[in-house]
């Protein structure tokens, strides 16, 4: 199991406040799945803008954000 901390901004949030979501799971794909579940079925995942992703204490950078965006794309309407 890995510890993930995902920071993101919701595109439809007027204040553009960064939100932090933490989860423990086996992969980044599963972490994104947990984030989508947290946001709820009625929320459009296309409005999620990742800013930082940390895996086991290490920022996984732009490559990690790109991988998370690919995982998130599975949930687009």
Where are these regions (language model features)?
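A short, exposed loop/beta-hairpin motif centered on an aromatic-Gly-Thr core
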Residues: 16-28
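A structural detector for beta-sheet-dominated domains
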Residues: 9, 24-26, 51, 73
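Hydrophobic residues positioned within well-ordered beta-strands of beta-sheet architectures
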Residues: 4-6, 19-21, 68
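Short intrinsically disordered coil segments
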Residues: 21-22, 37-40, 69
């Amino acid at each position: 199991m890995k510890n993930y901390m995902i920071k993101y901004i919701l595109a439809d949030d007027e204040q553009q406040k960064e939100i932090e979501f933490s989860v423990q799971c086996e992969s980044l794909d599963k972490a994104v799945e947990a984030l989508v579940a947290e946001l709820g079925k009625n929320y459009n995942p296309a409005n999620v803008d990742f800013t930082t992703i940390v895996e086991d204490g290490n920022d996984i950078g732009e490559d990690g954000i790109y991988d998370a965006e690919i995982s998130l794309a599975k949930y687009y309407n």
